[in-house]
């Protein structure tokens, strides 16, 4: 099946296959093609920490994520505009998704004030007063020339009462309408615009948020407000019902998630796109994802271990260095430890999603899931019930 998402958008989405709820798809964007399910490395400040652009290409990343909030504050729009956009500034010629800055603004807590017009906050860099609104967020992301633009929304905190979550999502819906109007009608931006579903842990509010976004109409839909401190059982509960209600012909993006197991479970429930800082952050702390689970390289048992980090991995780190060497680098506090670890962890995530795509193409996704958990010594969680 093939769909043109929106006559005003240059993005196309094609669903290539399905196993249960799991989907194999393809996104065509202004800067290239993205095969889904996909994991997007996070490049908050215009760089994936510890990685050269050529390293990101070598791990076979298809698309990366940038942060509107941080890039707006530093280096600022003028510098990026002088370079002709974020792609040229950071020397990355493949697709980029930028979040709107909403999550970062609302994580400032008492440092920000929310009004209907937008949010006023103190810059965490120099303390100056900054105002961010749906319209300004759209203008920033146009200067960045993001292939996928995210709407400016309020990320519902956890925990939140039903009343608090409803008030928050209704503000986000009003902002979503303003985002679309400004993106399409004022800016004439043909890059993709995604809506973000909020509503906390309440199914009726998630429905209200989704239905409101559908009335406005977006090129894709993201699930926000998860991985914000809720128990995993709560996250799975939302994923059990929400993706199945989202449009079949548009990409589904789970924001900020997460662990390899979370990605597998979300794919089983119909999600297509993921991002998370976990692989890079864990690498800087000596925690490496491997086929059989997790290696904490600072453990003294690796001091004489001459095996590669993961014998199943084809990354630069695993093809050239032993666990003993990585242990040595960590104990010495060498910068190279986090660099080699980041290369490996991000390649692991790319191999994971590539394996999922291959299994979906070959009709062996159930076997893939069983093998994934068996290698970790874990029981296979129940499949979602349709």
Swiss-Prot record:
GO terms for cellular component: cytosol. Zn(2+) binds at residues 313, 315, 318, 344. The active site is at 99 (proton acceptor), 275 (nucleophile). It catalyses: 7-aminomethyl-7-carbaguanine + guanosine(34) in tRNA = 7-aminomethyl-7-carbaguanosine(34) in tRNA + guanine. The keyword Transferase applies. GO terms for molecular function: metal ion binding; tRNA-guanosine(34) queuine transglycosylase activity. The keyword Thylakoid does not apply. Keywords: Glycosyltransferase, Metal-binding, Queuosine biosynthesis, Transferase, tRNA processing, Zinc. GO terms for biological process: queuosine biosynthetic process; tRNA wobble guanine modification; tRNA-guanine transglycosylation. It holds the Pfam family TGT. Residues 256-262, 280-284 are annotated as: RNA binding. Its EC number is 2.4.2.29. Binds 1 zinc ion per subunit. Catalyzes the base-exchange of a guanine (G) residue with the queuine precursor 7-aminomethyl-7-deazaguanine (PreQ1) at position 34 (anticodon wobble position) in tRNAs with GU(N) anticodons (tRNA-Asp, -Asn, -His and -Tyr). Catalysis occurs through a double-displacement mechanism. The nucleophile active site attacks the C1' of nucleotide 34 to detach the guanine base from the RNA, forming a covalent enzyme-RNA intermediate. The proton acceptor active site deprotonates the incoming PreQ1, allowing a nucleophilic attack on the C1' of the ribose to form the product. Homodimer. Within each dimer, one monomer is responsible for RNA recognition and catalysis, while the other monomer binds to the replacement base PreQ1. Belongs to the queuine tRNA-ribosyltransferase family. This is Queuine tRNA-ribosyltransferase. It comes from Acinetobacter baylyi (strain ATCC 33305 / BD413 / ADP1). The lineage of its organism: Bacteria, Pseudomonadati, Pseudomonadota, Gammaproteobacteria, Moraxellales.
